Amino acid sequence: MPIKSRAVVIPRRNTVELRTVQVLDPRPGDVLVRTAYTSISAGTERMLLDGRMPHPALLFPVVPGYETVGQVVQVGAKAPKELLGQWVYVGGARCFR
């Protein structure tokens, strides 16, 4: 069954929405982390909101925030099973559809 989550989304310039998003299933070497804390940096997110982010992969719609602390709740087929339940720091992620 697909997992849903709530996320802040910037769908277009100068617009912020709270949306329900579908969480991607972990690929074989990936893990799924339930976020407890995430940071929003004033510089990066301001550029995203203003539509001035130079990185080509960051196109609208975008979910801001890329540093997360949370607990591993699911592991992919080739990911170490001992990671389940571990608290981790994530410095970037592939998360939402």
Segments predicted by a language model, with ranges:
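Residue-level signal for short segments within beta-strands and strand-turn junctions
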Residues: 9-11, 50, 72
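Short structural boundary motif marking the start of a folded domain
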Residues: 2-7
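Intrinsically disordered, low-complexity, positively charged segments
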Residues: 16, 40-41
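Glycine-rich beta-strand-centered segment in the early N-terminal region that forms part
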Residues: 23-40, 52-96
